[in-house]
Curated annotation (Swiss-Prot):
Keyword Metal-binding among record annotations: no
Annotated Thioredoxin domain residues: 19-156
Cysteine disulfide links: 54-57
This protein's record includes keyword Disulfide bond: yes
Family classification: Belongs to the thioredoxin family.
Keywords assigned: Disulfide bond, Redox-active center, Signal
Lineage of the species this protein comes from: Bacteria, Pseudomonadati, Pseudomonadota, Gammaproteobacteria, Pasteurellales
Annotated TM spans: none
Name of the protein in question: Uncharacterized protein HI_1453
Signal peptide positions on this chain: 1-18
Organism: Haemophilus influenzae (strain ATCC 51907 / DSM 11121 / KW20 / Rd)
Pfam families: AhpC-TSA
One example GO MF annotation: oxidoreductase activity
Length: 156
């Protein structure tokens, strides 16, 4: 009975995202310019949700930087931070802090309204989102994922 319930809950949670499209979520880049995820339409997208106070998130940034630099990927790699949400710095403080880091290949977008947190039901950090080429949320995975794990999930 427990197995049946577990299978039902997993199937239900996957279907909960079936209609969640993130194309029109309003974000900003590190220059405070407006961005929507729609510019990534056409390729699957991996999104790492993270926070500046999260040591596990910070430990994984070098690997995300390397993955972001790869030219032969068949999926996009972006990261999203939510200023003023879940204990994160405000926008200006985060941008100033991030500019002091050495990661030059990572695309960092800011979700100031917390829309992604709400739509994807982000419970903690790091939190990974996998979007299809139409930017529908197809899978979420909490916790750290290495580059090889990201490739496996993104290419499914």
């Amino acid at each position: 009975m427990k197995k049946l319930l577990s299978i039902f809950l997993m199937a239900f949670s996957l279907n909960a995202f079936a209609q969640t499209n993130l194309a029109d979520v309003q974000l900003k880049d590190l220059n405070n310019q407006p961005v929507t995820l729609s510019q990534y339409k056409g390729k699957p997208v991996y999104v790492k949700m993270w926070a500046s106070w999260c040591p596990i998130c910070l430990a994984g940034l070098a690997e995300i930087d390397d993955l972001s630099a790869e030219k032969d990927r068949n999926f996009e790699v972006i990261t999203i931070v939510s200023p003023d949400h879940k204990g994160e710095k405000d926008t200006a403080d985060f941008i100033e802090w991030y500019k002091g880091l050495e990661y030059k290949n990572i695309t960092v977008l800011l979700d100031e309204k917390g829309e992604i947190i709400d739509k994807a039901r982000v419970r903690g950090y790091p939190f990974n989102l996998f979007l299809d080429s139409d930017l529908n949320l197809k899978k979420t995975v909490p916790g750290h994922l290495g580059a090889e794990q990201i490739r496996v999930f993104a290419e499914k």
